[in-house]
């Protein structure tokens, strides 16, 4: 009988690893079993996770984990979790570009790092002015010729336009008085990306080819010129592409990526002069504690063709102000999104050559 050839010995210093056939297949089968669950059961699981302490961060990460199982679980989670306008909660990255609630503001705060010109946005987790917070976005300031740009990203360690986490940017003119807000995604179907040289994005590492990556202008922020150096606070005006405040979430879904949503015009709320303190004052309801030229409140500008719009002039849609040397609060509500509010707040940093 022929002698059986023994297996070759392992290389010197090497290790012998036992290969178990089918491990990858078992993992795939397990994932398929999760994906084969009835949609109704998936939705019920997400509802129970949300109800069992998953309403606030950090426990809300369990809801996000459900959406990470597979595509069907993600669809189920997105269907169950209501947007910020209805729930008052920020859950998924997409929530950052959806309008906030109408009845109360989303309370956030910004931390500034002067050394590297970076700004970090956090969602407040308690009623305290500043707490540990849930990180939402970051922005870094860059000087590009006569312009200043703030690149906004979901990743605090990758603040570039080529990043998968790129959200958009804010770009100023030479004077620092006029800004344009750019979104990385088209606000509606057929929107044209900016063709300026600084907005072209070479070497993009984005994975998803379904939605074009670029810079789409979605808003402007302007500060009124003050060449005579007259005494008084800054004056601001904003024009943004936002859904109407009367739009429901279902209507927003129907019209998304179909047509322009129209402009929402905001102006700063005029402060009053405090004779005793000899300064301009606004009521920030305890959310701002340090006097600063950067502090502001924005309200909807009255439409001369709509008498009812004057009633909304007293509702503060965005307020921003200083509480420490490098900490600022930022509270926003419908129709603004967290991304829009962050971009407007960033415009308050830096020197306004013609305003100060």
Swiss-Prot record:
Residues 21-31 have a biased composition (Acidic residues). Transmembrane segments: none annotated. Residues 1-31 are annotated as: Disordered. Residues 1-12 have a biased composition (Pro residues). Residues 32-88 form the F-box domain. InterPro entries: Tubby-like_C, Tubby_C, Tubby_C_CS. It comes from the Eukaryota. Ubiquitous. Belongs to the TUB family. This is Tubby-like F-box protein 1. The lineage of its organism: Eukaryota, Viridiplantae, Streptophyta, Embryophyta, Tracheophyta. The gene is TULP1.
